[in-house]
Amino acid sequence: PAGAADALGELSDEGSPAYAAAARFTRANVAQKAGDTKRAVAMLGAIAGDSDVPQSYRDLATLRRTGIEFDTLKPDAIIARLKPLTDPASPWFASAAEMTAIAHLRKGERSEAGRIYADIAARDDTAPTLKQRSLQMAGMLGVDAVNDSSKEAAKSAEPTG
């Protein structure tokens, strides 16, 4: 393990931007697994703030950091931090939007949370488990998130007379 840590350190410092970022993520993961959450959060924050790192890695670092810190952050801080990732064009939209919806729930903003869950559920690229969870959450919050084609498919599957 000591040799691996040294190799990761070298990659972090001297590798191409993508390899260096991957090594830095691995080091943050190792810190988190070892129970050093503070160090993991700091490492992920450094990745997120490093303009030499490809944007997709920076966004992932923001998402991971927010996930680790989620229970200790104020809802408004979560919403602000994840705002760029909740753009529908973002590849991180569904994950960031789910955390944002939970933050709105923590603020007592049920209708906004329901709208966000409906947006997550409506996307074709949302993972099936997240889509199902979002449909359920939207429904519990009073938002009909079942799209018309899903309603028609369910209706046509009902037995007739």
Predicted feature locations:
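Short extracytoplasmic
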Residues: P1-A21
